[in-house]
Amino acid sequence: MGVEIWLPLERWKDQRCFRLRYKVEPEPRPFLTLQPVKVSPDPEWDPRWEEWHCYLIPLTIDIQDYQQLLAGCFDRVFHTKDPIDGWPMDSLDLCSPNWLGEEDWRTILTAIRGEMGEASRRKRKFYDTFLRWLEAALTHTSIIVAEGNQ
């Protein structure tokens, strides 16, 4: 039996954030957290906060690292639509939850792979770790929320 990746909804405090860092900066810093969503097949589903805070190992990235290494790749998916309600999204809002669907994440994966060829060894390691986390998360969900704390 493998590790259960989804926590019971009432145990969201048991999440173990994986902190991916390129630059080592003193804490606390603004960051971006990627929270896979426990998707329901119910057509009337309206996700509760706990349903996007119950993935065992969400990913956290310092905002500075995001802006330097990933923002250009994320920008390629905008203008997009919220995968739940279809609401248009023009850019990633670092102050609130951003619901991105699997197609958006696959576009981001492709963009990052394109960046890896010209990247230094250290950047490639950062990108590779990000890609492995994201690909693993996408085997469990089709929606991941990107939420900043600014």
Go through the PLM ranges and name each one.
Residues M1-S142, G148-Q150:
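Acidic (Asp/Glu-rich) sequence patches and key acidic residues
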